């Protein structure tokens, strides 16, 4: 008797993870392989698309090798969003690196659009502000940089896809070329009202529709595996879910109805809540598609560009590359001593959306120590999450009762207590570090008939801890006001 499992992949910026999930929603095995990001020029962030595929294969093989008498009955994929690449349709060879969501090569293009009628059109159709974060403007630059890129694209010789699409192509041996609604909605080329690629936006950014994948529900049959070479994964296994990682975490947390909000802490961070209908013009926030599982579900989101990566940058500057050691250094300081770090290393995301903002370390004096600077870097994670949380409260016009949290940084108990004290709201911390992969597995299980309703998935057992805020800490609240002043300084424009 073999135990049926779903192989769920969570391909992030810094790690490719694989988990095996059974019909009771339990993780039976897991593995992770580290990934590299390169910065060949200032403002450019890239990854090797084939190295990502090899890392996914390695993680999957290690995960499956630890199972006893199990059979993979479905593959589900969660992925870093807004990263994009171009590959040759005939050979499957990447024509570009995977251009990361952090990449800013399209900054000038986006600045030229700011405040224009075209920018208003983009936001009204996609729910997204004009920003280099999103693939549309990046693809405009990538096709221009690729020899004969525009001509080849118009002839249909090239494929354009986000990470889910690339992995689906690889798992299927080049037979499946599709993406899901959640990833399509992040390209800034997808009309979230009509549920299709938008011809006006394709023309605006110069992207031929013939190069784009089919868009299918997140929970659906996306293809079948080919001969991948992954031990333990047979050919002809259905690929049953594709979904962006933040959306997958929302689903994995069991948040399928409005009124709850989650934050995923990673390289960057995402705060997201489900909504019934698109909520356009929510100041500083984006409206997007949460998922499609037979029914289209929308979400309100705030994207923060640098949280974990901002803290890591501080570590590099201090010569402390270990996050563990950097955290210990930060916590050795009793307070930030008025020092603040605004990690606008490639502009600011939500709720400011300021591409011209620049990183700032302020409040320094002759008594400032490396420990104080490290603490400023750690606190910046919580301050940025608070900025988006309060923006969401303002849009909701109601107090949000709690914040569900997941991601690597949630293992830092001090940071989570600081976050709760800052928000004056309880945090509900999911002890499972693989929430995005679980969310993809849940959607895949729904496709396979393991679960019929979202309520069943929301009711699955989850190991959580509630972190209550301390009594009102006036020092923390005053510090937050100083943070807001620091952000304003980071956004100052130098005089011409």
Curated annotation (Swiss-Prot):
Q: Reply yes or no: does the keyword Cytoplasm apply.
A: no
Q: What does this protein do?
A: Involved in catabolism of D-apiose. Catalyzes phosphorylation of apulose to form apulose 4-phosphate.
What Pfam families does the annotation carry?
A: FGGY_C, FGGY_N
Q: What EC designation does it have?
A: 2.7.1.233
Pathway per its UniProt entry is: Carbohydrate metabolism
InterPro entries found in the cross-reference section: ATPase_NBD, Carb_kinase_FGGY, FGGY_C, FGGY_N
Q: Which family would the database say this protein is a member of?
A: Belongs to the FGGY kinase family.
First-tier enzyme category under EC: transferase
A GO BP annotation: glycerol catabolic process
Indicate what this protein is called per its UniProt record. Answer: Apulose kinase
Q: Which residues bind ATP?
A: 13-15, 267, 308, 408-412
Q: Which parts pass through the membrane?
A: none
Keywords from the named record: ATP-binding, Carbohydrate metabolism, Kinase, Nucleotide-binding, Transferase
Q: Which GO terms describe its molecular function?
A: ATP binding; glycerol kinase activity
Question: What is one cellular component GO term in this UniProt entry?
Answer: cytosol
Reactions listed under catalytic activity: apulose + ATP = apulose 4-phosphate + ADP + H(+)
